[in-house]
Structure formats: C-alpha cells, structure tokens
C-alpha cells in the first residue's frame, strides 16, 4: 500500500509459482495478470478508474483464447475476438464506425477460412449487436456461396450465388 492505496499484490500457486499479480500503474490505470499452473499467462486485464477496459485470455499453451476492448464511455465493445487453441480465429468483431456503433464481424471455419462476414450495429434496446446490410457466406474452401440481406437484425432476403462465383 502507498498512502492507503493498493499498489501491488501477488498470489502464488501451491507450488510457489506466481498465480496472480496486480499493479497500480498510476492514479488512474492498473493492470492484473493471472497465470496458469504451468507458468503461462492466463489473462491480462487493464483497468481505467477501476473499470476493466481491455481483457485478454490465454490457453495454457500460450495462444490467445479471447481478446476484448470496451468503449470507454459507451456500453459496447470496440473489439471482441475469439480464437482456437492453435491460434486460428473463431470469430472477430471490430468497430468500424464509433458514431453509429457499427462493426465488421466475421466467423471462421475450423480450417481458418472465413465462414461468413458482414456488418452489425449495436442496439441499445437489446444491449447487443444485430446484423445489418448484406452478409456473405463461404464454404470451407473460401468460395462465396450465398448472401443474406438483413433488416433490423432479421434475414430479409437470401441470394444464392453460382457455385464457381468467387
């Protein structure tokens, strides 16, 4: 403690390896890391004014499992990415327009190819994103197979594409 404020603390696994550490970086920012029993980083959380703003979770092999970054003043995320143990993506969500809370979203096949992609918009009434515009769907080889047009988060129309259309 320094002047009544927690500055640093550490917890340890039963075998003596570091399990968790917290550091106050300054009066506003702090950082917490947790570790797997094998010593690999498990998670890292960055705080601003006591609120988690960035979080990264790791598999025990060291690969990133999940990464998120929250908007500092709005109730939505700027980024949410999910990965497989081999490091290949499962899904990604990245803000492309903060003013309209619009995101580029993609989902991936186990082989790493894009399964579908399109845009989504944060809906404050649902406290979640919903798909908007045209979404493209791909087969495992990466060929675009069909498109869906979304209106208010619901499929409005489906457009099949030719089997050989890239």
Give the label of every model feature segment:
Residues 1-166:
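Glycine/tyrosine- and acidic-biased, solvent-exposed loop/turn segments at the edges of beta-strands
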